[in-house]
Regions:
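Glycine-rich segments within core transmembrane alpha-helices of 12-TM secondary carriers
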Residues: 2-6, 105-111, 162-167, 171, ...
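Intracellular juxtamembrane helix-capping segments at the cytosolic ends
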Residues: 84-87, 164-177, 319, 396-413
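Structural signature of the two symmetry-related core transmembrane helices
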Residues: 126-141, 149, 192, 340, ...
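Central mid-sequence intracellular linker of multi-pass
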Residues: 14-63, 70, 207-280
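Flexible cytoplasmic loops linking transmembrane helices in multi-pass membrane transporters
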Residues: 42-95, 257-326
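Helix-breaking motifs and short loop linkers at transmembrane-helix boundaries and internal kinks
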Residues: 123, 144-149, 161, 178, ...
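C-terminal transmembrane bundle
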Residues: 3, 7, 155, 159, ...
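Hydrophobic alpha-helical transmembrane and interfacial-helix anchor sites in secondary transporters
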Residues: 16, 118, 204, 348-351
Length: 434
């Protein structure tokens, strides 16, 4: 759902050819006649998109003046199918198009850390539910928006709510999965959308769906997400970390019942763990120096996480939004290559650990980036496409491994806030990349 919103402009943000609109009193003129008669020719030989002659029709031998226009005609079957024509984001209003990309990214980056703190204090589930239904209502409002300010505001709500929902669900998945399978499930959670959503949207964009149909796809997926969030229980790991042991026991016993584990045995095991937790709390109070050392280590790891998220997100968003390797063959090659790369990364995470895997993936991505710069400087267009495709695969994989490393870096009591803070760094990178 996050990538559906991030890449929505592939469907509803198409650039549209435009020209100054024919006045009502000259509406009998064909578009070709109007352009030949009333639109200036630019230096490149094309008709001007933003100016027209005043007066529109020659009424004497005097020279006519080219003046800017404030209404436009568009080369699109339905004006409402692209935000460019829907809100007239052309000529002196063209900057509003870029603004509609930057404001949601920046706003989401600012809001996410605050909501992350809330999730660490009141729980993953309440924040996840609130944000899931917020993005559903905001998506519906965005679909029916008729003015640019409403569109921009609802898009900001969508980005903020969607990002926080994803972070909460990812954190929940990380916390309820055992150590043996954690790397598998968390990486798959990131790999599936990274691999399949960009090609899927490319295929959908080929058929040029109408505004309502394109948004209906997002509304349906968001509705399914909200329904799933409603059925999810609170993270027992967070409940234990915050010492809400009564609720933690209820959740653990429910999970035991759902997974066919003997409930009485699960209750006995939980009581034993509860006793160990009390002894650990006593030891922690007796040795405050150890807590200080752990805090210093956490700060160093957090700094590396923030830098990694900034770099990887900036590169990934830039590659996805300005992709040059488009077409069915390229998309199929991307899917196959990404599956192999993610599978290799998963194997490395199991055998070498997340940190070494992330370092290796970033080295490969950096190598491809340098190689692409070299072949581009030499004008090797065909080779550039292949190198670009490889870079996109490694950056996508690196983004996934970075998020897994982020979840491992922060302890449970501040994990959601830590991931959201790294998302802020990534959001700043996204703005740079966009």
């Amino acid at each position: 759902v996050v990538l559906f919103h991030y890449l929505a402009y592939k469907l509803v943000g198409k650039q549209v050819d435009h020209w100054c609109m024919t006045p009502d009193d000259l509406s009998f003129l064909s578009i070709a006649t109007w352009k030949n008669t009333s639109i200036p020719i630019e230096a490149d030989g094309n008709y001007s998109r933003c100016t027209m002659y005043d007066p529109p029709l020659p009424i004497s031998q005097e020279n006519r003046t080219a003046v800017p226009c404030h209404q436009w005609g568009y080369d699109i079957a339905n004006k409402a199918d692209s935000i460019v024509s829907r809100f007239d984001l052309v000529c002196d209003r063209e900057y509003l198009y870029d603004l509609s990309e930057i404001v949601p990214l920046f706003g989401s980056g600012l809001v996410s850390p605050a909501l992350g703190l809330v999730a660490d204090h009141v729980g993953r589930r309440p924040v996840m539910l609130a944000c899931a239904f917020t993005q559903l209502f905001a998506t519906v409002a965005n679909t029916f928006s008729e003015t640019y300010p409403l569109f921009l505001f609802t898009r900001f709500l969508i980005f903020a709510a969607t990002d926080v929902t994803f972070i909460a669900t990812f954190t929940l998945l990380h916390e309820v999965t055992g150590n043996a399978r954690r790397s598998t499930f968390t990486l798959i959670d990131i790999a599936v959308p990274h691999i399949f959503v960009p090609p899927l949207l490319h295929v959908i964009s080929i058929v040029k769906p109408r505004w309502m149909l394109a948004n209906a796809l997002t509304i349906v997926t968001t509705g399914l997400l909200a329904s799933w969030c409603w059925l999810v229980e609170e993270s027992p790991t967070w409940l234990v970390a915050t010492r809400d042991l009564r609720r933690a026991e209820v959740t653990v016993l429910l999970a035991a019942r759902e997974n066919g584990v003997d409930v009485a045995k699960a209750r006995t095991t939980f009581k034993a763990i509860e006793g160990q937790l009390r002894r650990l709390d006593t030891c922690a109070m007796a040795d405050p120096m150890e807590a200080i050392i752990e805090t210093m280590k956490l700060r160093r790891r957090a700094a590396s996480v923030l830098l990694a998220r900034f770099v990887m997100d900036a590169t990934y968003i830039s590659l996805i939004m300005n992709d040059v390797t488009t077409g069915i063959r390229w998309e199929a090659a991307y899917v196959l290559s990404s599956v192999v790369c993610y599978a290799s990364a998963l194997g490395c995470m199991r055998s070498c650990g997340i940190r070494k895997t992330l370092s290796g993936v970033m080295v490969m991505a950096s190598t491809f980036a340098v190689f692409e710069a070299m072949v581009m400087s030499r004008g090797e267009k065909v080779l550039t496409l292949y190198v670009h495709a490889g870079l996109k695969v490694f950056v996508s994989t690196g983004s996934g491994v970075t998020l897994c490393y982020t979840a491992e870096t922060f302890p449970t009591v501040v994990r959601n806030a830590g991931i959201c803070l790294s998302h802020f760094a990534g959001g700043m990178g996204c703005i740079l990349g966009a």
